[in-house]
């Protein structure tokens, strides 16, 4: 079944979850991106269960936050964080477009990658350490949202190179069906989040959309289009910024009213 092969390709490429090994046939790759957000659903499910079980067992806020910070990296294998680090090095180099693309391919991590990843994990740890039941559900769902937006970019943005991971998937993908599937994911996730908290949903989605717009502008201006590393950069940045916006908004609401409404 071709759709099942597409599912295995998506999970084998973008996660550490063990799946049956399949040949990367073009017919299967056409729909692989359609299943990319499902990896976010797995991460979000494990994230929320860890939050719930951690508090049930009274593990303490620090240990729970450490576990929640680790889960996206452990399940994804760090592929998106690798792109974030490479992009930070390239952006911070202030070099030409061609030189930035070369830096993205460099397997070594520079000082800016290390510094910015440290700041990222510090902020992420702080963000998950103050989660409540409502915000934990919203942020768990955002693992799907970030991947749906990333999937849209893969088929809709121009690529910086004619080769590479994003170019390979874009050339093979059925753009119309991938776009429709990403929109469906977004609609379902937004409806789900609205049932939890309309205010936090609006705040989180507006932040995610701003990150998406910024991603396109940065990719086109500094690199001439998107790449696999830039896609990873957007994904982890979107999850962090949306998460911070959600917990800050929640804190303002609780502080201002004294209760949830």
Swiss-Prot record:
<feature type="transmembrane region" description="Helical">
    <location>
        <begin position="240"/>
        <end position="260"/>
    </location>
</feature>
<feature type="transmembrane region" description="Helical">
    <location>
        <begin position="125"/>
        <end position="145"/>
    </location>
</feature>
<keyword id="KW-0472">Membrane</keyword>
<feature type="transmembrane region" description="Helical">
    <location>
        <begin position="183"/>
        <end position="203"/>
    </location>
</feature>
<feature type="transmembrane region" description="Helical">
    <location>
        <begin position="31"/>
        <end position="51"/>
    </location>
</feature>
<keyword id="KW-1003">Cell membrane</keyword>
<feature type="transmembrane region" description="Helical">
    <location>
        <begin position="59"/>
        <end position="79"/>
    </location>
</feature>
<dbReference type="Pfam" id="PF02654">
    <property type="entry name" value="CobS"/>
</dbReference>
<dbReference type="GO" id="GO:0005886">
    <property type="term" value="C:plasma membrane"/>
</dbReference>
<keyword id="KW-0808">Transferase</keyword>
<keyword id="KW-0812">Transmembrane</keyword>
<dbReference type="InterPro" id="IPR003805">
    <property type="entry name" value="CobS"/>
</dbReference>
<dbReference type="GO" id="GO:0008818">
    <property type="term" value="F:cobalamin 5'-phosphate synthase activity"/>
</dbReference>
<comment type="function">
    <text>Joins adenosylcobinamide-GDP and alpha-ribazole to generate adenosylcobalamin (Ado-cobalamin). Also synthesizes adenosylcobalamin 5'-phosphate from adenosylcobinamide-GDP and alpha-ribazole 5'-phosphate.</text>
</comment>
<protein>
    <recommendedName>
        <fullName>Adenosylcobinamide-GDP ribazoletransferase</fullName>
        <ecNumber>2.7.8.26</ecNumber>
    </recommendedName>
</protein>
<dbReference type="GO" id="GO:0009236">
    <property type="term" value="P:cobalamin biosynthetic process"/>
</dbReference>
<comment type="pathway">
    <text>Cofactor biosynthesis; adenosylcobalamin biosynthesis; adenosylcobalamin from cob(II)yrinate a,c-diamide: step 7/7.</text>
</comment>
<keyword id="KW-0169">Cobalamin biosynthesis</keyword>
<comment type="similarity">
    <text>Belongs to the CobS family.</text>
</comment>
<keyword id="KW-1133">Transmembrane helix</keyword>
<dbReference type="GO" id="GO:0051073">
    <property type="term" value="F:adenosylcobinamide-GDP ribazoletransferase activity"/>
</dbReference>
<keyword id="KW-0460">Magnesium</keyword>
């Amino acid at each position: 079944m071709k759709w099942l092969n597409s599912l295995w390709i998506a999970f084998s490429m973008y996660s550490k979850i063990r799946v049956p090994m399949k040949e990367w046939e073009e017919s299967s790759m056409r729909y692989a991106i359609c299943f990319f957000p499902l990896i976010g659903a797995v991460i979000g499910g494990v994230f929320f269960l860890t939050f719930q079980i951690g508090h049930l067992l009274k593990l303490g806020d620090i240990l729970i936050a450490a576990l929640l910070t680790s889960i996206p990296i452990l399940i994804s294998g760090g592929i998106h964080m690798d792109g974030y680090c490479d992009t930070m090095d390239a952006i911070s180099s202030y070099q030409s477009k061609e030189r930035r693309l070369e830096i993205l391919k460099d397997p070594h991590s520079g000082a800016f990658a290390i510094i910015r990843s440290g700041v990222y994990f510090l902020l992420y740890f702080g963000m998950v350490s103050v989660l409540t039941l409502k915000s934990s559900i919203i942020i768990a769902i955002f693992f799907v949202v970030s991947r749906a937006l990333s999937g849209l970019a893969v088929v809709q943005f121009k690529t910086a190179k004619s080769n590479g991971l994003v170019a390979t998937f874009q050339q093979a993908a059925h753009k119309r069906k991938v776009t429709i599937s990403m929109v469906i994911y977004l609609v379902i996730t937004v409806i789900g989040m609205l049932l939890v908290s309309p205010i936090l949903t609006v705040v989180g989605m507006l932040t995610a959309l701003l990150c998406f717009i910024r991603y396109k502008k940065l990719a086109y201006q500094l690199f001439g289009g998107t790449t696999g590393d830039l896609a990873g950069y957007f994904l982890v940045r979107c999850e962090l910024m949306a998460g911070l916006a959600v917990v800050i908004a929640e804190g303002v609401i609780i502080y201002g009213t004294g209760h949830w409404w």
